[in-house]
């Protein structure tokens, strides 16, 4: 049976599209509000951090719940919560809008571990154990949401301001109801194939390999979240209109989607560790070129290539993280996704301080260096 013909999987990936469509409007909203509210880059990073923490700290809890009650209520409830808080945020005045954007992260926290659990569970049933491919399809729809968000949201913001984003809400309600109808209510606690062990490894080797994996995951998330959060602000500071920097942000997310799908497909066929290492090493090149070429016509290909290379290893890292905790699909999904979201936002806060003090060129160079470091560290992991 084709995975895409599975009603539960279809509802899950459509839900991911809607959740990340709303999530990805946040950087555009913050860029628009930065002038009337006087938001610094540090404060923008702090809002993004608080939004992520409000969700990431809860993801293991929601994952634990998914293992016991199934994904249906968590996925559907997460979508509808996101829609409600987003709708209130775009019509609320002043700092209340920021508070509502932060609280909306709870809906994302409920959705992501349950959705990722359902995606990989569907792969074990319908895609001959190709979990990385299934995870990449799940994350592909999320990336499509990130692509559509600036492409649609930029013109809406330019024409009607933040209230114009209410036009996105009619997409969320039917998808939330569809998830409530079609998703499984079966508990998610079940054995997962563990990460491939190495015969008789020393404790020190295992500890270093695990720490290397943690650092690689944090670096990948930091690099990608930096670009998602600050690319609109970078071009806004250069004087570009919302419609233009929305298109540039969408170009980055198109690259991320293409890279993520390609990396996931390759991850079921060749060495996953090599994909992670090579993609991050290569990502340092376009990121390092941003200070010289970002404000030219080369900004579009740089956005696409940097998105593709930073996103190529994402589903591989998530699936490997799930396998480190076999037996609890929901809890393991919540832990690894919560960690990636939190690590990315903490890094983004640091980069916001750096941008305020030294400018965005310094942020791009630092992000490039982090990717190179992550690519080298990946060689020490046991991702296979």
Named regions from a protein language model:
Residues 24, 52-60, 146-147, 253-261, ...:
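Residue-level signature of mid-helix packing/kink "hotspots" within the transmembrane helices
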Residues 57-94, 270:
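Conserved MFS/SLC helix-loop-helix module at the cytosolic interface between two early adjacent transmembrane helices
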Residues 100-140:
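Cytoplasmic helix-loop-helix junction between adjacent transmembrane helices
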Residues 270-317:
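C-terminal transmembrane helical hairpin of 12-TM major facilitator-type secondary transporters
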Residues 26-27, 208-250, 257:
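Extracytoplasmic gate region of multi-pass secondary transporters
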Residues 94, 137-184:
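Helix-loop-helix hairpin linking two adjacent transmembrane segments in secondary transporters
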Residues 58-70, 157, 259-271, 355-356:
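Helix-to-loop junctions at the C-terminal end of transmembrane segments
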Residues 73-87, 274-289, 368:
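Structural signature of the two symmetry-related core transmembrane helices
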């Amino acid at each position: 049976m084709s995975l895409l013909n599975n009603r539960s999987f279809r509802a899950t990936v459509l839900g991911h599209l809607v959740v990340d469509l709303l999530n990805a409007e946040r950087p555009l909203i913050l860029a628009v509000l930065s002038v009337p509210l006087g938001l610094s880059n540090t404060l923008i990073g702090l809002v993004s951090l608080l939004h992520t923490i409000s969700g990431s700290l809860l993801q293991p809890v929601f994952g634990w719940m998914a293992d016991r009650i199934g994904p249906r209520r968590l996925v559907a409830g997460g979508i509808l919560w996101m829609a409600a808080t987003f709708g209130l945020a775009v019509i609320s005045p002043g700092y209340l809008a920021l508070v509502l954007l932060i609280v909306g992260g709870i809906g994302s926290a409920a959705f992501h571990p349950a959705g990722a659990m359902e995606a990989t569970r569907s792969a074990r049933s319908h895609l001959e154990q190709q979990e990385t491919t299934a995870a990449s399809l799940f994350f592909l729809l999320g990336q499509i949401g990130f692509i559509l968000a600036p492409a649609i949201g930029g013109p809406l913001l330019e024409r009607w301001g933040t209230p114009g984003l209410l036009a996105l809400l009619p997409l969320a309600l039917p998808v939330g109801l569809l998830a409530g109808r079609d998703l499984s209510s079966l508990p998610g606690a079940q054995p997962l194939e563990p990460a491939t062990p190495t015969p008789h490894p020393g404790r020190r080797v295992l500890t270093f390999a695990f720490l290397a994996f943690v650092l690689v995951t944090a670096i990948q998330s930091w690099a990608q979240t930096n670009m998602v959060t600050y690319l609109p602000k970078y071009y806004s500071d250069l004087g570009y209109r919302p419609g233009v920097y929305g298109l540039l942000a969408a170009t980055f997310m198109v690259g991320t989607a293409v890279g993520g799908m390609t990396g996931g497909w390759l991850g079921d066929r060749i060495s996953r560790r090599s994909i992670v290492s090579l993609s991050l090493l290569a990502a340092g090149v376009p990121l390092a070129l941003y200070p010289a070429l970002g404000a030219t016509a080369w900004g579009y290909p740089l956005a696409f290539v940097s998105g593709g290379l930073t996103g190529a290893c994402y589903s591989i890292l998530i699936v490997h993280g799930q396998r480190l905790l076999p037996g609890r699909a929901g809890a393991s999904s919540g832990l690894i996704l919560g960690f990636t979201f939190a690590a990315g936002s903490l890094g983004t806060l640091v980069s916001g301080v750096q941008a305020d003090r030294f400018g965005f060129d310094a942020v791009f160079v630092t992000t490039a260096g982090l990717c190179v470091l992550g690519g080298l560290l990946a060689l020490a992991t046991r991702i296979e």
